[in-house]
Amino acid sequence: RMLAKHELSRLPGLPPLTSSPCLYEECLMQQPRLLVESGQPGLLVEVSSGDFKRLLSKATAGSFAVPLSSIRPNLDRPDDDRAEISQAVQSFTARRIQKRLEETIEIPPLPHTAQKIIKLRVNPDATVDDITGVVETDPALAAQVISWAASPYYAAPGRIRSVEDAIVRVLGFDLVINLALGLALGKTISLPNDKPQDATPYWQQAIYTAAVIEGLTRAIPREQRPEPGLSYLAGLLHNFGYLVLAHVFPPHFSLICRHLEANPHLSHSHVEQHLLGITREQIGAWLMRLWGMPEELAAALRFQNDPGYDGEDAAYPNLVCLAVRMLRNRGIGSGPDAEVPQQLFDRLGITREKANDAIAKVLAAEAALRALAMQFNSPH
């Protein structure tokens, strides 16, 4: 209500505007000039520390800030992930560490439908009838695949009456097998009730990212193009570690949400590393490997925040990195705007112009994609 009254979208760093209690970091007063949140995205107010001090007459000083240089998310040491996840579980949950990390965390088993789909993915002789049969054994999943194909985003002529219709007439075998796998996995862990204020809803972020990746993949030269369906799946599941963090560390997840709200200029990796000692990318990739998912998918989740990654299966994390950053720079997603370096386009063999075209097509169909996401976005 307070933000609406002043027509603001964020809490401004100007205490007199609100009657709320104010706590400020005392080291700020050692700086000659300050940049404080204005209440509008991308707009800061520059003020001298002396003038700002006069606004703090009813505020309380404290010493609680941490220099970013002391927080170092593990971007490039995947071999340390298991030990770091174990340490976080031991430190921040009441769970007693067992010999196997997966027993300690109590991760749900891979759904039966997903197990069948994984077997089909690696079967070169799999047919449309095979995937239709598997999807239709899970009525909720079948309904989701049909509604996906019926979305105005795909503009299919006539009604989509069955899973077979969705495959043959609209989506194709490769996309459906990966879409079905993504939806099946997405249901294994519930959406958390808590989330950072103003965060893009989980499935909206997932669907937009997958749609952008679909367009980017088509723009990559055929000889270096990664598997389109697997790229799409990487987009759908890129933020799966967010669900895992909420499942494994429930009380601390709320703390992460509040820290993200208080630090909109920071990536989630810094906040999670500071509070837990691990990031959603680490635990998401670990779970993909535990479930026996394709290594390309684990790499996509693990290295998606590193625009310079050029290791094994680099195209998949590079595509996620590019899609997420381009969406974020257009106001979709959470965290600060991030530069998209030219080397990222060069490594994928795609021009900046073609990437912009791909994202423009997705944003032109934003209403259709948002309607699709609405079916998934309530906690379940």
Which functions belong to the PLM regions below?
Residues 1-83:
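Extended, low-hydrophobicity, polar/charged segments
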Residues 2-3, 228, 295-299, 350-359:
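Short, surface-exposed acidic
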Residues 2-9, 70-71, 302-306, 358-363:
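Short linear loop/turn motifs
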Residues 9-10, 54, 142, 308, ...:
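A broad, structure-centric signal for solvent-exposed, well-ordered loop/edge residues
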Residues 43-56, 209, 269-279, 342-351:
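Short secondary-structure transition/capping segments
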Residues 51-71, 213, 278-286, 349-362:
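A short, terminal or domain-edge coil/loop segment
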Residues 72-340, 379:
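Conserved alpha-helical "signature site"
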Residues 94, 325, 338, 342-380:
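Terminal helices and disordered tails flanking the catalytic cores of nucleotide-processing hydrolases
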